[in-house]
Amino acid sequence: MTTHKERIQACINGELTDRPPVALWRHFPVDDQAPGTLAKATLNFQQTYDFDLVKVTPASSFCVRDWGVEDEWKGHTEGTRQYTKRVIQHPRDWEHLPVLEPSAPHL
C-alpha cells in the first residue's frame, strides 16, 4: 500500500503511481475565526475524505488583520467575507503601514 507521502513523492519524481494524487480544499467560514477551530475543521475534513495533501485555508483576510482591517462573514457558503473596516482610505496611507513581525497574531 502506498502512503500519501510516497504517492506524492513518486509523482514529483516522475514515477508511476498506483493512482494520481488527489487534493481538494475548501473554506470553513465559521470555523476559520480561530486557529483551533480551523485546525479541527481541517482535520475532520481530511479524516472524512483521506486526501493525499492537506491544505489549510484560512479566511482571505488573515494577512491584513494585523494592520487593523476588520471583516465579517455574512453567510456566503464559499467563505467570502465583507470588509467592515479598511485601513487604506487614501493613497498616502500605504506609506504609513507598519512593518509586521512574522509572529503577529494573524500571520
In which residue ranges do the predicted regions lie?
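Catalytic cores of TIM-barrel enzymes
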Residues: 1-107
